[in-house]
Amino acid sequence: MQNLGFTEADWKLFRKRLPEWQERYMEGLVEEYKAFLSSEVPASTKFWELEKRLKNDRRKTGVLAEGISRSNMKFLMMDLINEGAIAEDDFDGFSDDFRDQLLFYYANVRKK
């Protein structure tokens, strides 16, 4: 079934991989937090900066994807690309048409 430029298999693969991508993305965030907390800045700066980062990061699709539906899948993928949660090699397994759309977005549109 073709729907909005992707197949049912693409939708199923997206739902399977999303938790894996989110876990990997959050592992990266935790490493960034650890590096920041190990820095030589005052404790109060660490506390307030970390609170600010956590508040911002928890809104990202790489942490919490809201509105997961077929009609939002492309937008969620674009968010994940823009956040750096996924890259080109994560497009493997998707249908050729959908993969081409993702590669075009990755190469030409994403926020760098």
Regions found by a protein language model. Give the residues of each.
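Acidic, Ser/Pro/Thr-rich low-complexity regulatory regions
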Residues: 1-112
